A protein has these predicted regions:
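A short, polar/charged loop-to-alpha-helix boundary motif
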Residues: 116-130, 255-256
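Active-site glycine-rich loop that binds ribose-phosphate moieties when present
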Residues: 123-139, 156-158
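Short glycine/proline- and charge-enriched loop/turn segments
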Residues: 53-61, 122-123, 223-228
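N-terminal active-site segment of His-dependent metallophosphoesterases
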Residues: 1-38, 174
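Short, glycine-anchored, charge-dense loop/turn motifs used at functional sites
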Residues: 6, 103-111, 239-249
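CN hydrolase (nitrilase-like) catalytic-core segments centered on the catalytic cysteine
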Residues: 66-86, 153-256
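Cys-nucleophile CN-hydrolase/nitrilase-fold catalytic domain and related Cys-dependent amidase chemistry
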Residues: 17, 26-113, 179-199, 203-206
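Beta-strand-turn-beta hairpins that frame and shape the catalytic cleft
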Residues: 1-6, 140-149, 172
């Protein structure tokens, strides 16, 4: 058994791509300065959660992995800081679009890409409009600091995903996430969300780390979105468990 120090970054995202990248870089540097060896950023942190609305012009936000700004930033920082850095991004592969993770090793090498398997299609979590279900299968990455399995947000609700990665040799499970208020049901899903992943840790005897965003994100009516007006409040609560599922660290609902 070896000790690995992991950081989960919880941040608020804006409509300004460059500002989000600069904030992410600042927080990655801070985590590395505190000794973190694996640093997890939230899902799709480059922008506000654009899947709240359906806009055909947002398809152009997707880029091939080698052209994505966040991935390029991640490769640079991973090499400079000697950290493992999974980076969530909107991927274009020829004519198909995916919700993906690029796993970057501590020497800046791109180890590979995992494409999100489970795609939600609920009010204001309208991901099937933007993403095709992934074709990579679940993946485990053999990094400098250990073998990590990575699921993306809605993947976290399915025990089969965690079990598959455990059987593939994962030692740690990571879940970058963008989750918040329920637009139809008047309920707080956070405790259920967290307990579900605690169960994955307990059942598979490995630590689980989840990184979520925070803040209220609003959609204003426009011709491009068919006049939609809506809002989601992302509830943060990023956390880490040990291998028995016991909570070891948990962030607040509204602080970075």
């Amino acid at each position: 058994m070896r000790n690995v120090k992991i950081a989960a970054i919880q941040m608020q995202c804006s409509t300004n791509l460059q500002a989000n990248l600069e904030k992410a870089e600042k927080m990655v540097r801070q985590a590395a300065g505190d000794g973190a060896q694996i640093i997890l950023l939230p899902e799709l942190f480059e922008r506000e959660y654009f899947c709240q609305q359906r806009r055909y012009d947002f398809y152009h936000l997707a880029k091939p992995v080698e052209e994505n700004d966040a991935v390029q930033m991640g490769m640079r920082l991973a090499k400079e800081l000697n950290v493992v850095l999974p980076v969530s991004f909107y991927e274009q592969d020829v004519n198909t679009l995916y919700n993906s993770i690029a796993c970057i090793d501590a020497d800046g090498t791109l180890l590979g890409v995992y494409r999100k398997t489970h795609i939600p299609d609920d009010h204001y979590y309208q991901e099937k409009f933007y993403f095709t279900p992934g074709n990579t299968g679940f993946k485990v990455f053999d990094t400098h600091f250990g073998k990590i399995g990575i699921g993306i947000c809605w993947d976290q609700w399915f025990p089969e995903a965690a079990r598959c990665m455990a059987l593939m040799g994962a030692e740690i499970l990571l879940y970058p996430t963008a989750i918040g208020s329920e637009p139809i049901l008047e309920c707080d899903s956070m405790p259920h969300w967290r307990r579900c992943m605690q169960g994955h840790a307990a059942a598979n005897l490995m630590p689980v780390i989840a990184a979520n965003r925070i803040g209220r994100e609003e959609v204003t009516p426009s011709p491009e979105n068919g006049g939609q007006s809506s809002a989601l409040v992302f509830y943060g609560s990023s956390f880490m468990t040990d291998e028995t599922g016991e909570l070891k660290a948990c962030a607040s609902r509204d602080q970075e």
